């Protein structure tokens, strides 16, 4: 990589870091190409991305961002998982690390909050933003459904009483 390519790469990574809410730092030593491809596919499906990084250039890109506190994690063969959803990248990385011990989670950052390995794993157990929205929508619609049921009940009872009276008179 020549100097201009490095400058472009740092600028590109800074742009990416400006758009995301979560960065997870991992060691990927020993992963095969097929395993890396599989992990990247799972990341894309979750709305996240996984990128192998050059440590020195990544430290330059982190300078001046809210993720600056994790710069010391970039030692050895590192890769980053990033996502806008604060849970997506953590969930995929934690699940993949459970299944494949070659992927090691070093830590991460949720905005300006630095996370250790346990923090990333704890974040992975939380429901995603879409799941939370679904639960909230369900909670909001439940009272309306119950009110509609209560309002319909007296009319149904009245109809059954009238039908019983009509059946009795007919007999």
UniProtKB/Swiss-Prot annotation:
Gene3D superfamilies: 3.30.70.1730, 6.10.250.290
Keywords (A to Z) from UniProt: Ribonucleoprotein, Ribosomal protein, RNA-binding, rRNA-binding
Biological processes per GO annotation: translation
One Pfam family of this chain: Ribosomal_L10
Coiled coil (UniProt feature): none
The family this protein is said to belong to: Belongs to the universal ribosomal protein uL10 family.
Record-linked PANTHER family: 39S RIBOSOMAL PROTEIN L10, MITOCHONDRIAL
Protein name: Large ribosomal subunit protein uL10
Taxonomic source organism: Paramagnetospirillum magneticum (strain ATCC 700264 / AMB-1) (Magnetospirillum magneticum)
Gene coding for it: rplJ
């Amino acid at each position: 990589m020549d100097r201009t390519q490095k400058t472009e790469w740092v600028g590109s990574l800074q742009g990416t870091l400006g758009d995301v809410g979560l960065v997870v730092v991992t060691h990927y030593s020993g992963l095969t190409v097929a395993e890396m491809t599989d992990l990247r596919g799972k990341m894309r499906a979750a709305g996240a991305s996984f990128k192998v990084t050059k440590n020195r250039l990544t430290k330059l890109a982190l300078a001046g961002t809210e993720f600056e506190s994790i710069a010391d994690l970039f030692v050895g063969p590192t890769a980053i998982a990033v996502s806008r959803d604060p849970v997506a990248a953590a969930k995929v990385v934690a699940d993949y690390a459970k299944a494949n011990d070659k992927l090691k989670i070093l830590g991460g950052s949720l905005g300006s909050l630095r996370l250790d390995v346990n923090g990333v794993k704890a974040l992975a157990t939380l429901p995603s933003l879409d799941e939370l929205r679904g639960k909230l929508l369900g909670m909001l619609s439940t009272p309306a459904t119950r009110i509609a049921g209560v309002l319909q009940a007296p009319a149904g009872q009245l109809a059954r009483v009238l039908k019983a009276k009509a059946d009795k008179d007919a007999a």
